[in-house]
Curated annotation (Swiss-Prot):
Extracellular side stretches: 36-937
Membrane-spanning residues: 938-958
Compartments in which it is found: Cell projection, Cilium, Flagellum membrane
Name listed for the protein in its UniProt record: Cation channel sperm-associated auxiliary subunit epsilon
Main subcellular location of this protein, as a coarse class: membrane
Organism: Mus musculus
Domain of life: Eukaryota
Signal sequence extent: 1-35
Cysteine pairs bridged by disulfides in the record: C87-C101, C130-C235, C275-C365, C439-C442, C617-C724, C737-C919, C753-C786, C838-C869
Family: Belongs to the CATSPERD family.
Species classification: Eukaryota, Metazoa, Chordata, Craniata, Vertebrata
Gene symbol of the encoding locus: Catspere
Length: 985
């Protein structure tokens, strides 16, 4: 590949010294920066080559003294490699060779060539983690499960297929290694990051693999393969983080479809799914490609003939990919491509047919929150110069606002010019920011940039304390960083701007030399991509593949060592293990080789850069127990966060807690401080909770609404730098009803009932309401489950259990009530109000129905109007000998049924305690009570006996006469009959 220019860190330090000398000599800051920029440009033009390094594994976390480091020089002036004595190279005069460093430490590697080349400082660890996990996945559709086959491999002896992740079974060396690890007690398991579930394998197969079966999942996709702490030849296995979701469908294009591309000469355009970065789409000036495995395989994306003209097909301006379909922006018009259609979106879908400038979607995956009422949440935002649209899962849009309304909100004259530049979602899942361009007299060459934030919770717009002046022709884009606070990175073609700490720290990103124009440091190239991750890394890629690095909350950018030449067509993206990689596109190669991915060792490159810059992290360790991005908090619950920072003595660091969103919680903090061996350790325990009491309030539902919401929090050290590798933990606490929670009565199950539906009749005298006829009821087994059959006189106390999507949580210890859903009233309770400790008369169904006439029985009594009977100040005196109709786990109150007859009862149970849950927790169960056989009527018995006796006597009389007839016919008459006379012959 053609080569690119590269300045070296030694030159950078010299230029920094030169700039300081110029400033001390009285030269203006602007002139000093111009001199330095000119020298940087000259250096980049004069250096004509680059070099890279690789290891056998795609995972650079095992970069150690055991690794075979492949060195590769790209250029024509190579002479030899300059390496330290602690390392050995196979061939010092070969541009491609292998390096081995047997001693841990920072090793300076440099090629000797015709021009002065850049040197890298490679950090080689003496790690005991040498082996890696390998896995394959088979999707099983009939039961929606996935079969994961796992084995161990050593990158230094693995097969080529294993190294490029195309192997279907282990190689011989991997099979032997896996069996040896199994003998030593190794057993892998898959751990899901979000729901924290664990899946274990069966025994090792004859092929030397473990097999794990797990269900397909769309909301728990981040997984880790872990194992026991087992070593072989002093080497352990590294944990493998990866994404595994339900199969993402790739739409194949029928023959005859036509290419859909970006304009000729445009840089590559990339879009990936918010939660599944392996599901992506790449648009080039030749073709558009789609993948579901980070471009290990791909298909072409084309347009059906007759919909777009030739010019339109080569005018793709923006693209956004979803599982439901893909949206293309062509000449201001949005087109939707799904499995069934390729169609233009217009006013019938709620969006303008022309004039659309762009669209965006959420950049951060917040599955657990977004899956709550997902159909009611927007999935993308589109905009024109004057209008902002919100798009939903059906790809229908609604208008959020327009510039006329925004002018009124901002109190701007209608004669001012206000245009929408861009729109982005915040890290807060229900907020979006609109970037506005404003000018009163637009004849000047500058314009003011404003930001307003829309809250979907309150449906309000808020103007932020942010203002930026840019040239009129500047095209501005922006992203919200992975932060609880609305931290922003913005960029035009040449500069990067920042806004940190809720718009209180605003400015322009500069390099250590003070330069803010990144194009001047990259041969005049424009900004192509800005990639952000959850750790706070921000990579700015220029069109000529020069890359800069910015750390979140840091206002300085550093230029990274050149990795790719200036003419290669590339984009940066994340692979299935959430690591940064580079995707190359070369239209001149065979079709199956046109796209190639290459891991990029970002951390190693940063360590090499920081060696010359002298940057260091102010703390040694920052730890916490925040293992999830999403926490749910119900009434009576609390969340305890443990965090700890270790730093050199006298630095005075501390842990900062920042929050954003609804202020619906209170928290307390407990600090512990320790000094030992010149280091300070601060431990902070933070407890989040609510103090609101919902009992005895008149506005129960309104009070609940005021105390529910989403609160975003982050814990961070008070000081940090570019070299701090630990990320600030960011999480959200959703206070409110958890839709996955439900209750069940112990012993009842709807799914394993073998009975069939049946009908029964309830006597009208047994109903709460008066009816003219008996009530016939159809018992639906699927709805009510199997009824529990109770013997004569047996009482029953329901034990209520609380569950969520992961199974049983606990036994409910709160008060609850129940009622028969068909209106039966022929049951009671075994304890009285007095026996349960009541001072005043307790609430009953009869009293609540009397207080709330014309209200459905389900709403007559509940947590909204519950009043306890254990205080003189609440309620009124009355008959305490009445049955107590409130139950709980500890009061031993039981349900009683009449013993004189049998009956079928279908009950609905409701949690009554107003301080137990934001959810309306109810369940249904059925009881079949077996009563005594009722005594028959005396007259009926006498009549029955009379009939039986009459029948018996009648039979006797008839049998007597029948016997006489037979006796006379066959005995008497033959004896008295004269013999017949014989005839004579």
């Amino acid at each position: 590949m053609p080569s690119a220019g590269q300045r070296k860190p030694g030159s950078l330090l010299a230029l920094q010294a030169l700039q300081k000398w110029l400033l001390r000599g009285g030269v203006g800051a602007m002139l000093a920066r111009q001199v330095v920029a000119a020298l940087l440009l000259w250096l980049s033009c004069c250096v004509s080559a680059l070099w890279r390094y690789y290891i056998n594994s795609q995972d650079y976390s095992i970069f150690s003294t055991r690794s075979s480091i492949k060195l590769e020089y790209e250029g024509n002036s190579f002479v030899s490699w300059k390496i330290p004595e602690s390392c050995k190279v196979e061939n010092t005069t070969s541009p491609k060779t292998t390096l081995h460093c047997k001693r841990a430490g920072i090793h300076t590697i440099k090629p000797i060539a015709g021009n002065q080349e850049v040197e890298r400082h490679l950090t080689v660890d003496n790690s005991y983690i040498c082996y890696l996990w390998y896995f394959t996945v088979v999707d099983v559709y009939y039961n929606l499960s996935q079969i994961v086959t796992i084995w161990v491999y050593d990158p230094e002896s693995a097969s080529t297929e294993e190294l490029i992740w195309t192997a279907k079974k282990p190689s011989l060396s991997s099979r032997v290694l896996t069996k040896q690890m199994n003998t030593l007690g190794q057993r892998p398991f898959i751990f899901t990051v979000e729901k924290r579930l664990t899946y274990h394998p069966g025994p090792l197969t004859s092929e030397g693999t473990w097999v794990i079966h797990l269900p397909m999942s769309s909301d728990d996709i981040a997984k880790v393969i872990r194992g026991n702490k087992v070593a072989f030849q002093d080497c352990f296995i590294a944990n493998l983080y990866f994404m595994l979701t339900y199969p993402m469908t790739i739409i194949s294009e029928p023959p005859g479809y036509e290419p859909l591309t970006v304009p000729p000469g445009s840089p590559l355009m990339l879009s990936w799914d918010t939660c599944i970065s392996t599901f992506a789409l790449l648009a080039t000036d030749q073709e558009t490609f789609q993948t579901n495995d980070s471009f290990q395989t791909w298909t072409r994306v084309r347009a059906p003939p007759g919909i777009l003209s030739d010019a339109q097909r080569h005018s793709l301006r923006d693209v956004i990919i979803f599982d439901q379909g893909t949206l293309f922006l062509v000449d201001g018009t949005v087109y939707l491509r799904t499995e069934d259609e390729f169609t233009k979106l217009d006013e019938s879908r709620g969006i303008s047919e022309t004039g659309i400038l762009g669209f965006s979607k959420r950049r951060w995956c917040q599955i657990r929150y977004l899956y709550k009422l997902a159909s009611k949440k927007s999935i993308l935002i589109a905009w024109s110069k004057t209008t902002v649209y919100a798009g939903y899962a059906t790809f229908r849009f609604v208008t959020l606002t327009d510039t006329a309304k925004l002018k009124d909100f901002l109190k701007l004259p209608q004669t001012d010019t206000l245009e929408v530049m861009s729109v982005e979602y915040l890290w807060h899942p229900l907020e979006a920011a609109v970037l506005l361009s404003h000018c009163s007299v637009c004849t000047t060459n500058t314009r003011n940039i404003r930001i307003v934030i829309y809250s979907a919770i309150f449906q309000t717009w808020t103007l932020q304390d942010f203002e930026l002046q840019l040239p009129k022709e500047a095209i501005l884009e922006f992203r919200f960083l992975y932060s609880a606070m609305p931290d922003i990175i913005m960029w035009d073609q040449h500069h990067v701007y920042y806004s940190y700490k809720n718009f209180t720290v605003v400015g322009t990103i500069s390099t250590p030399s003070g330069e803010t124009n990144l194009s001047s440091l990259s041969q005049g190239s424009k900004i192509h991509q800005v990639l952000t991750d959850r750790i706070g890394n921000v990579v700015v890629k220029m069109e000529n593949n020069v890359m800069f690095y910015i750390k979140a909350d840091i206002t300085e950018a550093v230029i990274l060592h050149t990795w790719v030449n200036t003419t290669a067509k590339t984009v940066v993206l994340f692979d299935k293990s959430f690591e940064v990689c580079i995707l190359y596109y070369n239209e001149n190669l065979d079709e199956k080789y046109q796209l190639q991915t290459q891991p990029y060792p970002l951390i190693l490159e940063l360590q090499s850069i920081n060696k010359d810059l002298g940057d260091w992290c102010p703390y040694l360790a920052f730890q916490h127990n925040i293992h999830s991005q999403f926490y749910h908090m119900d009434k009576g619950e609390s969340l305890t966060i443990w965090s700890q920072i270790v730093y050199p003595e006298n630095r005075g660091l501390y842990i900062v807690v920042e929050h954003y969103g609804s202020s619906v919680m209170t928290w307390t903090q407990n600090l512990e401080y320790e000094i030992a061996s010149g280091f300070c350790t601060k431990t902070m325990i933070t407890r989040f909770f609510q103090t609101t009491n919902y009992e005895l309030v008149d506005n129960y539902y309104q009070l609940q609404k005021e105390n529910t919401g989403l609160m975003l929090l982050q814990f961070r050290p008070s000081e940090f730098s570019r070299t701090c590798l630990t990320a600030k933990p960011v999480f959200e606490i959703d206070v409110g009803c958890d839709s996955s929670k439900y209750i069940m009565v112990r012993g009842f199950n709807k799914s394993r009932c073998q009975r069939r539906d049946f009908s029964y009749v309830i006597d009208k005298e047994l109903l709460r309401e008066s009816l003219s006829d008996n009530l016939k009821v159809r018992y639906d087994v699927a709805k009510y489950g199997c009824p529990l059959t109770l013997e004569l006189g047996q009482m029953f106390q329901p034990i209520v259990e609380l569950y969520d999507e992961n199974g049983f949580i606990k036994i409910v210890d709160a008060n609850f009530i129940l009622w028969e859903i068909h209106g039966r009233n022929d049951y009671t309770f075994n304890s009285t109000m007095e026996q349960n400790g009541c001072i005043n008369e307790a609430q009953t169904w009869d009293s609540m129905i009397e207080e709330n006439p014309d209200i459905p029985l389900d709403d007559v009594w509940g947590p909204q109007n519950y009043r306890p009977c254990f205080s003189y100040a609440i309620g009124k005196p009355g008959d305490l000998g009445q049955p107590y109709e409130i139950l709980n786990y500890s009061n031993k109150n039981h349900i009683k049924w009449p013993m004189t007859y049998a009956g079928m009862y279908v009950y609905r149970l409701k949690i009554l305690d107003p301080n137990y849950s934001f959810c309306n927790l109810t369940t249904i169960f059925a009881i079949e009570s077996l009563g005594m056989i009722p005594r028959s009527s005396v007259y009926l018995v006498a009549a029955l006996i009379f009939v039986l006796m009459l029948t018996f006597i009648s039979i006797l009389v008839l049998s007597y006469f029948w016997y006489l007839k037979i006796y006379r016919q066959f005995i008497i008459e033959p004896l008295h009959k004269r013999p017949a006379k014989q005839k004579k012959n």
